[in-house]
Amino acid sequence: MKLNREDVLHIARLARLGLEEDEINRLSKELSALLEHFEVLQQVDTTGVEPTSQSTPVKSVLKEDTIKPSYAREDILSNAPRREGDYIRIRAVME
C-alpha cells in the first residue's frame, strides 16, 4: 500500500505533528514500506496456530515478599520529635 502526501499529512495532523517538506517525502516512503511488510504478514497462513499475547514466559524478576516483625509502635512514637496521640506529627508540606 502506497501512502501519498495527503495520507501522511492526515496522519501528521492526527498526531499533531508539524512536518517539513522533506519529512513528508521521507515518511511517505518509510510508512509505505512498513505497510508493505504488514501486507506480507497478512498473507501468512496461521491456521492451527494458537493465538497468544505473550511469546515468552512471564517470570517476575522481583523476589517474594517476606513478612518480618516490625518495631513496636510505642518505640517508634517515643523517638518521634513531635507526636499527636498515636501519630507522628510533622510540619505541613503543602498549604
Curated annotation (Swiss-Prot):
It catalyses: L-glutamyl-tRNA(Gln) + L-glutamine + ATP + H2O = L-glutaminyl-tRNA(Gln) + L-glutamate + ADP + phosphate + H(+); L-aspartyl-tRNA(Asn) + L-glutamine + ATP + H2O = L-asparaginyl-tRNA(Asn) + L-glutamate + ADP + phosphate + 2 H(+). One of its GO terms (biological process) is regulation of translational fidelity. Pfam families: GatC (PF02686). InterPro entries: Asp/Glu-ADT_sf_sub_c, GatC. Keywords: ATP-binding, Ligase, Nucleotide-binding, Protein biosynthesis. One of its GO terms (molecular function) is ATP binding. It comes from the Bacteria. Its EC number is 6.3.5.-. Heterotrimer of A, B and C subunits. NCBIfam families: gatC. Allows the formation of correctly charged Asn-tRNA(Asn) or Gln-tRNA(Gln) through the transamidation of misacylated Asp-tRNA(Asn) or Glu-tRNA(Gln) in organisms which lack either or both of asparaginyl-tRNA or glutaminyl-tRNA synthetases. The reaction takes place in the presence of glutamine and ATP through an activated phospho-Asp-tRNA(Asn) or phospho-Glu-tRNA(Gln). Belongs to the GatC family. This is Aspartyl/glutamyl-tRNA(Asn/Gln) amidotransferase subunit C. It comes from Dehalococcoides mccartyi (strain ATCC BAA-2100 / JCM 16839 / KCTC 5957 / BAV1). The lineage of its organism: Bacteria, Bacillati, Chloroflexota, Dehalococcoidia, Dehalococcoidales. The gene is gatC.
